[in-house]
Amino acid sequence: MPSGRLQQQFIRLWQCCDGKTQDTTLNELADLLNCSRRHMRTLLNTMQARGWLTWEAEVGRGKRSRLTFLYTGLALQQQRAEDLLEQDRIDQLVQLVGDKSAVRQMLISHLGRSFRQGRHILRVLYYRPMHNLLPGTALRRSETHIARQIFSSLTRVNEENGELEADIAHHWQQISPLLWRFYLRPGIHFHHGRELEMEDVIASLTRINTLPLYSHITKIDSPTAWTLDIHLSQPDRWLPWLLGQVPAMILPREWETLANFASHPIGTGPYAVRRNTPNQLKILAFDDYFGYRALIDEVNVWVLPDISEEPACGLMLEGPIQGGEKAIESRLEEGCYYLLFDARTPRGAHPQVREWVSHVLSPTNLLYHADEPLQQLWFPAYGLLPRWHHARPGPGEKPAGLETLTLTFYREHIEHRVIARIMSALLAEHQVHLHIQEIDYDQWHAGEIESDIWLNSANFTLPLDFSLFAHLCEVPLLQNCIPRDWQDDAAQWRAGEMNLANWCQQLLANKAIVPLIHHWLIIQGQRSMRGLRMNTLGWFDFKSAWFAPPDP
């Protein structure tokens, strides 16, 4: 019998007997465990051989045998829990222990670095699962980061300085204003073993042609081996950066036929997905990666939803602290939480409503009414970027007849709930009821349901001149809520003729967007980890991090 099953049987027997020595029979014990008399004898003999109990059998009708426990069920449960932790069986651990606070403490004690069978393993604690990792779909901040570890694209944007680097394409050039040529590396392999072919690249880039930022791609072909031509309907100085973004990651052309591809995707990146469940995401270093092999062999993201109730619920790498090993990496996000007024509803489009609501729900009001732990993580926002001060809050008078407003945000985000509660209380002081809708991220991203205002957040990556417009333009919700010629804006941006600061100031001037809070991103880690540089998404590049060996 497998060790885990035997441990479960012992714990159950110990609980049924209250851990006390007693005189009993095989039949009585078999009834307790719902098994046959013969199987019960086998269980007792095996448990006795393990040193967990003694079974003094008496032969004869009416005679009772003595059962003595040498090991407590609690001790064995703890041992079983440790075994499950080492095996990364978090779902079974939660079932075994039951108490989520106890599970949390056990997980934290095993965070950080682990060295098993010659492999470096990093364990991370996160507050929600990541079910969808499919490029070109609605991905949140963390899914975007993980996708970058799994997939490759024609180009790559350096997370630290925003500079463009080679990836699948080793060189590229602009042949004419409407034609770019990329030269691809041969011999690249997908995680499932097949070699990447030009058809995979063409299929991957063709499938995203419906997205706004890629809609100007008119034709993709290969004039010669490992050479890719991309034809455009309008010039685009940002095209090489655009092809380094997650939607343009390269998938095997048969991806739609592969089981559970969104949660278990296959790419050509430095890490391959081994497991993705509600309790754990495990990715392994890909030995056949065409770039430098990752130095951390395995990354385990353990999911414990209850940690989202804490204000600093981002990324935890902190294991047992030894000799002042704890380190905290932090940065103020390049982006903010903001309110988005929906021009499709009468209240959302009303200038006086926008003016008054933005006054009542000002950054300083939100910060003042927040709990102290959140006040340490929040910074008032007066522009989409921390360095900008575009917002001009006015006094505003409450519009006559305003009695209710609808606010919508996406699930699994504790700070959205906190901000919404503060907003509800502030508006209630003025006899306005805030109706709150909490929806799935896909629904929020599409923005097709009715709401007066939406609670959003944006994290812009480097280079900001590229990502600020690209991020806002690629979210259908914003295009639905803000009536303007987005295609004309995109043409100006592609041509390098857009003044982004002025463009953002226009959005803030009519209160279409109202910045609320900049957030401090935090990674709680260990000083033994090298190469950990937090990116603008609040994560770090796994393949570039490594562990310093202990002092001899």
Curated annotation (Swiss-Prot):
Disulfide cysteine pairs (residue numbers): none
Top-level taxon in the UniProt lineage: Bacteria
InterPro entries given in the database record: SBP_5 (IPR039424), SBP_5_dom (IPR000914), SgrR_HTH_N (IPR025370), Tscrpt_reg_SgrR (IPR023767), WH_DNA-bd_sf (IPR036390)
Keyword entries, A-Z: Activator, DNA-binding, Repressor, Transcription, Transcription regulation
Domain HTH marR-type residues, every copy: 1-116
Protein task: Activates the small RNA gene sgrS under glucose-phosphate stress conditions as well as yfdZ. Represses its own transcription under both stress and non-stress conditions. Might act as a sensor of the intracellular accumulation of phosphoglucose by binding these molecules in its C-terminal solute-binding domain.
Keyword flag Repressor: yes
Stretch list, region Solute-binding: 163-493
GO biological process: one example: positive regulation of DNA-templated transcription
Name the record gives this protein: HTH-type transcriptional regulator SgrR
Organism: Salmonella paratyphi A (strain ATCC 9150 / SARB42)
GO molecular function, one term: peptide transmembrane transporter activity
Source taxonomy: Bacteria, Pseudomonadati, Pseudomonadota, Gammaproteobacteria, Enterobacterales
DNA-binding region per Swiss-Prot/TrEMBL record: 26-49
Gene, per the UniProt record: sgrR
